[in-house]
Amino acid sequence: MWFKNLQVHRFSAPWSLSADEVEASLAKHAFFPGTSLEMQTQGWASPRDNGQLVHTVGGQMLLTLRTEKKLLPTTVVNQVTRARAAEIEEQQGYKPGRKQMKELKEQVTEELLPRAFSIRRDTRVWIDPDNGWLAIDAAATAKADEVRGMLFKALDPLPLINLHVNQSPVAAMTEWLAGDAAPGGFTVDQEIELQSGAESKATVRYVRHPLDPEDLRRHIAAGKRCTRLAMTWNDRVSFVLTDGLVVKKVAPLDVIKEQADGTAHDEDERFDADFTMMAGELSGMLGDLTEALGGERKA
């Protein structure tokens, strides 16, 4: 159940909401399947499909935002609209105008929507009240923005801010590579992206490739900066840090898997054990990563 991505946030004031209070607030914006004429619906769903919108273990909270979207390709709508427009032109003797075409397209969309397939996407949120972390499991900023918007809507007021650090990820990652020295507790892995600041945006990528410090220094001397860097924290968690301070490709390593609680009797107990371990490890990793980036900068 480990998160694969971390869009990291902090609280500008101590977290004060209980799980029951969060549950009650989310319930006002709970997910319900859309009608046949709705293109998209969105709301909070149970992370464990047990009716509870907040899953809590040891004070750690897990939320799930569910999005249901109809798959209605624009090409299909345009194709049917053009066919209808041709019929209208034949009947009235001239092509439909812009306003008529717009109305026709809306009519076609309404007719096709009930027959469109629906897909659901769940985006998870982890809240660590004690250490002040909130992370969204989303690789794309746009998806994280959706979640943030729904959080602010449900938990108003919510003292949520982006994590700010004293040294930019680009400057720090470039410095680590130039000096061939990762910060304490971290190692550099075999995935790197270096990008030029020039208009050409010339880019060099290493993927599962041995790193030559001299080659890296030459690229850096030529003006390229590190925008993506794979790292491992304490031989326990691997990840990729991006220039936007998004943590991607998060994965527990074997040492954590070996420490997993083998006494769990059922799926629910295993899930809770995994969630507890994930929260503990990622909280420690985020704290160390923040320090490696010069510490937290208060907004």
UniProtKB/Swiss-Prot annotation:
GO terms for biological process: DNA recombination; regulation of DNA recombination. Its main location: cytoplasm. Keywords: Cytoplasm, DNA recombination. It is found in: Cytoplasm, Nucleoid. The keyword Nucleotidyltransferase does not apply. GO terms for cellular component: bacterial nucleoid; cytoplasm. May be involved in recombination. HAMAP family: RdgC (MF_00194). This is Recombination-associated protein RdgC. It comes from Cupriavidus necator (strain ATCC 17699 / DSM 428 / KCTC 22496 / NCIMB 10442 / H16 / Stanier 337).
